[in-house]
């Protein structure tokens, strides 16, 4: 039996909480190894950090998002490293557990968790 239920308008993300400062500092400590130019703009440094983490972990769809913890009232936006979402193309290309474990090791983080994302970010 094929049941097609309407997709929820909520976009969920599997990811790890981070901070802008952590990402900027990560670039500073890995700049030479990846031949990254010195840059004072935090937006560029955050993207450089994502690029380095993608290379190190093999998680090509790794990105930053603002997420909401499920059950967090009032809902506060938290910066996260998004590993994959519940969107079909993202979920289909989700990373292996070994890749996620490597990312956790780099971040010194616990298990990734589910976050709610703002659907307007995907329009």
What kind of feature is each model-predicted range?
Residues 113-120:
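Intrinsically disordered, low-complexity basic segments at termini and long loops, enriched
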Residues 1-109, 121-123:
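Acidic (Asp/Glu-rich) sequence patches and key acidic residues
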